[in-house]
């Protein structure tokens, strides 16, 4: 079999990544591509001015102000519809923007990515309109940070057997 006729999965199995079959990503619609280019430029400028990965690693903490700043850029609501304070971008645009952010700091990328992918994705896909109206605007602006709690002592990481419940504190300000 000729090398150029070898399938992607087969070549991947043998440790050969056929970049010609992966890159570039499929083309974006022109107006989305323009938005992505502007977002990537803004991410680069933001990163150059504000990201200090070494300090964050030394402090074992990322300042909340950083999350506030990426929220101001719109990065916390890339997939949320505009009517809910998001940018309403397609997944491909999300991928391009995250590719840029990941070149600067993986911890920030995971924070922003988890918020949208495993954090509020179920709300986007399965939430009713009342739930979307209640939560998405604040999730898209970073006022709320979405989370997904999976591992617990009695079930490990088996999501089907989780028994933990969130209980509102007596002062009504947070859940435990």
Predicted regions and their residues:
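A generic alpha-helix structural signal
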Residues: 40, 67, 98, 132-136, ...
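Extended, charge-enriched "interface" segments that sit outside catalytic cores
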Residues: 1-53, 60, 65
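Short coil/turn segments at secondary-structure boundaries
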Residues: 56-63, 82, 110-114, 151
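N-terminal cofactor/phosphate-binding cores enriched in small/glycine residues
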Residues: 36-56, 66-82, 92, 96
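Internal helix-loop-helix
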Residues: 72-142
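A short beta-turn/loop motif at secondary-structure boundaries
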Residues: 61, 68-69, 154-156
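Glycine-rich, Trp-frequent "lid" loop and neighboring beta-strands that shape
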Residues: 86-87, 130-176
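Conserved active-site and cofactor/substrate-binding residues in soluble primary-metabolism enzymes
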Residues: 38, 61, 65, 92, ...
């Amino acid at each position: 079999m000729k090398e150029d006729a070898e399938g992607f999965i087969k070549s991947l199995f043998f440790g050969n990544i056929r970049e010609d079959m992966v890159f570039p990503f499929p083309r974006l619609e022109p107006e989305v591509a323009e938005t992505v280019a502007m977002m990537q430029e803004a991410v680069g400028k933001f990163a150059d001015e504000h990201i200090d990965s070494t300090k964050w690693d030394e402090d074992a903490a990322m300042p909340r102000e950083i999350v506030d700043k990426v929220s101001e850029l719109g990065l916390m609501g890339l997939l949320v519809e505009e009517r809910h304070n998001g940018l309403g971008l397609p997944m491909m645009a999300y991928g391009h923007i995250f590719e840029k952010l990941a070149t600067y700091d993986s911890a920030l990328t995971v924070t922003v990515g988890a918020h949208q992918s495993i954090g509020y994705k179920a709300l986007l896909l399965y939430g009713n309109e009342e739930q979307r109206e209640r939560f998405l605007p604040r999730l898209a602006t970073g006022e709320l940070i979405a989370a997904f709690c999976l591992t617990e002592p009695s079930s490990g990481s088996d999501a089907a057997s989780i028994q933990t419940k969130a209980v509102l504190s007596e002062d009504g300000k947070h859940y435990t």
